[in-house]
Amino acid sequence: GHGAYQAPDWTADWLHRELTNWLDITANQEFGKNFADLNDEQQTLLKARLTKEYRGSKVENGTVVLSNTRLAAMEKTAQYYISLYGDDPATKVTREHFAMKDNTLPDLQARKDLAKFFFWTAWTASAERPNTHASYTNNWPHEPLINNVPTPENVIWSIASVVFLIAGIGFVV
């Protein structure tokens, strides 16, 4: 985000929006209703497929392989960001909440490129590295829809960094 107090972490925001779009698209294709309107069993089934698709996403011959459903979810998510960073009245209130000016990125191509960048950061945060159960970002940011939780290494190094910081400040003082 830009300051964390005003706007979201864009990677986390994109990832969550794309996941919920995927769930709604799939629910409508298979059950004829939105994900929130499904029963618990149907929701559990779709969440398991969602996790498998996103955590199992990989690169083959230098190309990220994505399903048609994921491509549709990405496009819907991209349209939100193109709107948000433009001057679309539909996202004006959100821009105000995020302390963003209208037409933050006036150039449409720049907005499309930004959306592609946000997708890429979300992909690295959700796809597991080969031969591991951790994403390229060590399962950060946290995203419960796909069981993206910080690895033990994340927790250990976070605690260690705070200890080193306090020790360093104590040494200087």
State where each predicted segment sits:
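Juxtamembrane interface at the cytosolic side of transmembrane helices
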Residues: 167-173
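N-terminal membrane-entry
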Residues: 151-165
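Soluble extramembrane regions of membrane proteins in the secretory/endomembrane system
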Residues: 1-155
